[in-house]
Amino acid sequence: MEQEVRELMVEQIKDTFSAEKQALRCMQKAVRKASTPALRDGIQMHIEQTQVQIERVEQIMESLKVRPGRKVCEAMRGLVEEAQHEIEEHEKGPVLDLVIVAGMQRIEHYEIAAYGTNIAIARALGEQEAVGLLSETLEEEKQTDLKLTEVTEQYIMAAALEGGSGETARRGSQARSKAS
């Protein structure tokens, strides 16, 4: 039974590696579309952080004597595709920034769940080095999620409600006018 759990850990770590690589590519595209400086800065910081997180996952794979192979995290693929599709639906501006935050937070929440599971499995198997590396990344993912919420509340939301961009903003202001 322990061997099955160890194999599960290997598959989960490979999945996490794929997820981080996909998230990194998504962020690299999103940072170019963001218009709020605090959001751009936050995404850029998390891009750099994600590169380190990928290195940590590589360290874990090395300690487990496995390679990532061709494993693709299908859940992350779906989250990234959805985020990219939604980003393409909006013009640059505060509403697009909200869309970027929404997509990034869905990705962060997936990563938080994945790292939590990975930590539990690694801990049960006595893989303390992996537990330490995974825990460090989990904390960073939680902090990124909080920062995204903070940037939204402090900078993006008011601008989106005031003007927004494109058709989405016009529909929102028409709805507010009718409600008045």
Question: Residue locations for each model-derived region?
Answer:
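Amphipathic alpha-helical hairpins
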Residues: M1-S180
